[in-house]
Structures are given as C-alpha cells and as structure tokens.
C-alpha cells in the first residue's frame, strides 16, 4: 500500500474521530492505556530487540536512553494516556462570541487540524503520546518513527489500534508507517493536500531535513541549547540546585542545560562549588579562559561547544562581565528554546525576560520545567521555536485551530 493511500485512509478516519464526543474520546484513551498494559510483555520484548540492535551498532548513550523501555516507563506511558483522557477537550470550545449590529452571531470555535504527521527517532513513547494527543484533539495521526525503534513502535501501535477497533473507530486514525525508506518519508512530506501538519521530533539533522523538504506546514525546534545565567545577586545554593537539576538529572532531554554563564563578580566563589557538584555527577566541564583561570584543570571550550546541544554529561561554561554580555552570548549561540536566570535582582530578572525571544524563559526555576506537563498543558506533543501557530511546549490546544461559525436569520450584506 502506498504512503498516499495510507494518508487518504487516515484522513477518512480523522473525520470519524472529529465527530466523537468528549466522553467517547475519554473512554477510547482509557481503553488504549489498558491495551498497552495488557501487551506489556510483547512491547518490552520488542524493545529488547531494538536495544540489542542499537547497542550492536554502537548507538550513543543519549539515544539508548531515549529508546529504552522498562516496566516503570511503560507504566508511565499508560498513565500519561489516562491523564490525557481526563484533560479538558479543546474541540468545540468557543473562544470569542459577538453579535454584530446586523444581528448575526459570530463565534470563534476550536476545531481539529485534521491529519498530523509525526516524524521522530528513537522515542517509542512518542508513538503512544502522539496518538493520544492527536486523537483527544479530534485528529488522525500518521506516525513515522525511526528504524532504531521499529519493533517497539509496531508493538505499541498494534495495541493502540486494537483499542480503536474495539471502540468501532477506524484503526487508520492511528497509522504507523512501517516502510522506513527515506523516499517514503519524502513522499509523505509532499502530501500537503492530505496532511495538515508535520511535527518532527529528534536530532537536528532529522528536523532540518523535514523542514527543508516538506510542502506540508511544519512546527519544529532544531535543538535545545539552554543556558543558565548566574547573576551577581544570585543565591549560591539556589543557583546550584538549578544547575544540578538542569544538567545532571536527564542530560538527554532537550530542556537540559548545555551552557553555564556566571557573572564575573561571583565567579571565584561560585565556579568551584559548581565544579565540585558537577564532577560528583560525572559531568565533563569545558570553559573559556576566565573560567579556566578559576578551574585550570578543565578543558577549553570552543565556539562549537557554545553552539552545541550535547544531550550528554558535558557542560560549556563562560564567565561574563554583566547581564548584557550574558544576553549577547545567548542571542549568538542560543536556539530560542529555554533560558534561565538565577538572580535576586528583580530589575535584572525583568530585563532577562523582556530581552530574549526564547519560547520559555525561567526566573529562579529549573530549565527542566520547560515541558508541557510541568507547565500545566497536561501533556505535550513537542516544543516549537517556530513563531507561527504555536510557540513553546505544545499541548492539546496546539493541535486545533480556530474557525468562524456565523449564525443568522437570513441577513445579507447588500
């Protein structure tokens, strides 16, 4: 079956999903969560095959972490589906209502986007997360995962499709592309008359490929080069907590810290504390000349380091003269993802917030909160640094659009 045929079937199924009541979608997602739990053994066995193949190919540790499933992670995925089931339904929400002087009633109402293509790499959890979010928002979804997770993705998709069938919803509403040839993905990205939106999740190379070759609209972020600026007024203990949580808890996440900027006035006090805490957590440090004057044992940092999304236990460091220098550094090397300031100066905090265009800006809070669930969206399908349609972590609302519904009693314009 061709990718165009699959997409057409998904579009037809999306029409069915768009008509489901909120209660029906909630019950469907609960059933999908139960199906994952029922198939846990099959899914974990499939994931073990993927992990074995990935290790044999020498896959990087960050990628292996994203690929791996276990009982706890699978239970977390099922729990996430149940959380999505209970989220408020954005479909049908009236966001504006007005009666015009001629008596027509004008409403802006949220409706599903239609068919969403998810293009992703070694993240089997995305198969379930994306399916749940797209269906809750009344859409069909075409899932094209990476070859690294093919067995995991098939096992997860089969379980979810069974729940769709049992609810009398066409299983094409959740279409997994098993043909992983690049030309098939290219064809999918050209189907702008069928597919309404593409969302790539993965490495910078994949995302740039999708953005450069798609005729379908794309929401994306290329990478997460996230900074922590420790201001002169920062509380040391607070700044250390933000640094450790942001860098060492899950370095493979796109909201982890990649660069530490420290105000020159506190560098001699803060850097040794930071270095000790990070070394205890096996973080490799690289710094500029001013940083290495305080920490001579660390490696020098290059321009490439400051622009890098390491996704690993590596941190670039730089001493800056003031807030303006920190802002200039972030503008030069940042990726508009997430930036953090540790400060007790409210004026500097406000300048930091107002001076950056990043999708998420944090004041005295960890970069790891740059996540749809943590920010109150309930769940997230991705993070956008594209300013059109959606910006920042994207939840259910980002998978809908507003349209006008006008009700009258025979009014005409002329």
UniProtKB/Swiss-Prot annotation:
Keywords: Amino-acid biosynthesis, Cytoplasm, NADP, Oxidoreductase, Proline biosynthesis
Main location: cytoplasm
Pfam families: Aldedh (PF00171)
Biological process terms in GO annotation: L-proline biosynthetic process
Segments passing through the bilayer: none
SUPFAM superfamilies: ALDH-like
Domain of life: Bacteria
GO cellular component, as recorded: cytoplasm
GO molecular function, one term: glutamate-5-semialdehyde dehydrogenase activity
EC number, as in UniProt: 1.2.1.41
Subcellular location per the Swiss-Prot or TrEMBL entry: Cytoplasm
Enzyme class: oxidoreductase
Family: Belongs to the gamma-glutamyl phosphate reductase family.
NCBIfam families: PRK00197.1, proA
PANTHER family: DELTA-1-PYRROLINE-5-CARBOXYLATE SYNTHASE, GLUTAMATE SEMIALDEHYDE DEHYDROGENASE
The protein, known as: Gamma-glutamyl phosphate reductase
Lineage of origin: Bacteria, Pseudomonadati, Pseudomonadota, Gammaproteobacteria, Lysobacterales
């Amino acid at each position: 079956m061709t990718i165009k045929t699959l997409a057409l079937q998904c579009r037809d199924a999306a029409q069915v999903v768009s008509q489901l009541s909120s209660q029906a979608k909630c019950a469907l997602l609960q059933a999908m969560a139960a199906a994952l739990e029922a198939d846990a053994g099959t899914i974990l066995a499939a994931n073990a095959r993927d992990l074995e193949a990935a290790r044999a190919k020498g896959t990087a540790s960050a990628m292996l972490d994203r690929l791996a499933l276990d009982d706890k992670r699978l239970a977390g995925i099922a729990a996430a589906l149940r959380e999505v089931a209970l989220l408020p339904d954005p479909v049908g929400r009236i966001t504006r209502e007005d009666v015009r002087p001629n008596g027509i009633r004008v409403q802006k109402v949220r409706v599903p986007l239609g068919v969403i293509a998810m293009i992703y790499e070694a993240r089997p959890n995305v198969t379930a997360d994306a399916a749940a979010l797209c269906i809750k928002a009344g859409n069909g979804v075409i899932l094209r995962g990476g070859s690294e997770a093919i067995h995991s993705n098939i096992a997860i998709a089969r379980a979810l499709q069974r729940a769709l069938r049992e609810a009398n919803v066409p299983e094409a509403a959740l279409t997994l592309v098993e043909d992983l040839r690049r030309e098939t993905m290219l064809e999918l990205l050209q189907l702008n008359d069928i597919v309404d939106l593409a969302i790539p999740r993965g490495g910078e190379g994949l995302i740039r490929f999708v953005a450069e070759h798609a005729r379908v609209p794309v929401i994306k972020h290329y990478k997460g080069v996230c900074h922590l600026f420790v201001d002169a007024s920062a509380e040391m203990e607070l700044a250390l907590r933000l640094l450790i949580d942001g860098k060492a808890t899950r370095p493979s996440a796109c909201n982890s810290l990649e660069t530490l900027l420290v105000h020159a006035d506190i560098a001699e006090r803060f850097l040794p504390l930071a270095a000790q805490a990070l070394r205890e957590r096996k973080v490799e440090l690289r710094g500029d000349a001013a940083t290495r004057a305080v920490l001579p044992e660390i490696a020098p940092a290059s321009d490439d380091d400051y622009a890098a999304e390491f996704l690993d236990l590596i941190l670039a460091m730089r001493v800056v003269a003031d807030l303006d220098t920190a802002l200039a550094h972030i503008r030069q090397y940042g990726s508009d993802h997430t930036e953090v300031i540790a400060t007790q100066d409210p004026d500097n905090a406000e300048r930091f917030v107002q001076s950056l265009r990043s999708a998420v800006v944090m004041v005295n809070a960890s970069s790891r909160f740059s996540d749809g669930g943590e920010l109150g969206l309930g769940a997230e399908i991705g993070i956008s640094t594209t300013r059109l349609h959606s910006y920042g972590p994207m939840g259910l609302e980002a998978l809908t659009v507003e349209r006008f519904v006008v009700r009258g009693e025979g009014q005409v314009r002329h």
